[in-house]
Amino acid sequence: MNKFVLKVLWLDKSVAIALDQCAGNTTHPLTEYFFWPRKDAWEELKNQLDTYSWIPPNEAIVLLNQTTDIINCWQEEGKQYSAKKIQEKFTQCLFVGHD
């Protein structure tokens, strides 16, 4: 089981990404939601991860790569997918949004 999970709000005009820590069958928020394109969600998440010295660099890279993939998918195909459908594409993340 992963130690961390990205929670994603999949919306029409933006996508928002937050980081949670996994503990058993529950998750605990580590960050607020960072929005794209209103702000640079990737950069904000990176800056937050840089302050968490207890998150190994290799795990931070994986989380940032997932964030890149999610943002790119939203930009290219966002309105074609419901939150439920996009969850099938990014199985290691948790998605909420309109269906």
Where in the sequence are the language-model features?
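The transition from N-terminal targeting/processing segments to the mature protein
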Residues: 1-99
